[in-house]
Amino acid sequence: MLAGLAWALPARAQPAIAPGLLDYAGTALARLIEGARQQAIADGVRPIPPGVYRALLGYFPPALLHRVRFAVGGTRRLSLPMLAFSYGDAKAITLGDVILFKNEQLADSNLKLWAHELTHVMQYQRWGIMGFAERYVRDSAGVEHEAVDTADRFAAWLPRRGSGASD
């Protein structure tokens, strides 16, 4: 999600960073995420494309797939998604239950990226926006590791699903 901006943060927070600063950074990130989510919704979001939905169904729960919305591109003003897409290597960014993709092609065809970002949606469901932001500031590598692992497992599962095999 925000790995493209991870160069600005340590992979794991160092003990020399005061806990109060980490708390402040977590609060600031949560505000940026919520603001970007609201802006994306105001700009217009869509349900998961039907072909992508069908491919994800069976690995991800239907309730999750029905809830998630997506859009393409960042906002026009200075924002977290704009920074992630312009100055980082982010292909997508997850803002609660809204996924912003850098371009339409990624949204239409990159199922592994969808699996990665849906994992972040599930993390938001477990932790809330503030909890997600706090964890991301303190251990972005750990947050991303779960999403990468899920995406890898999904990619391995996808070719087998038609044969009746399941995990």
Question: Where in the sequence are the language-model features?
Answer:
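Catalytic Zn2+-binding segment of zinc metalloproteases
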Residues: 118-134
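Active-site metal-coordination segments of metallo-dependent hydrolases
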Residues: 42-50, 135-148
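Acidic/histidine-rich, surface-exposed loop or edge segments in extracytoplasmic proteins
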Residues: 27-42
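Short pre-active-site segment immediately N-terminal to the catalytic Zn-binding motif
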Residues: 98-115, 137-139
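Auxiliary, metal-adjacent structural segments of Zn-dependent hydrolase domains
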Residues: 43-93, 98, 153-161, 167
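N-terminal signal peptide c-region/cleavage motif recognized by signal peptidases
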Residues: 8-10
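N-terminal export leaders
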Residues: 1-2
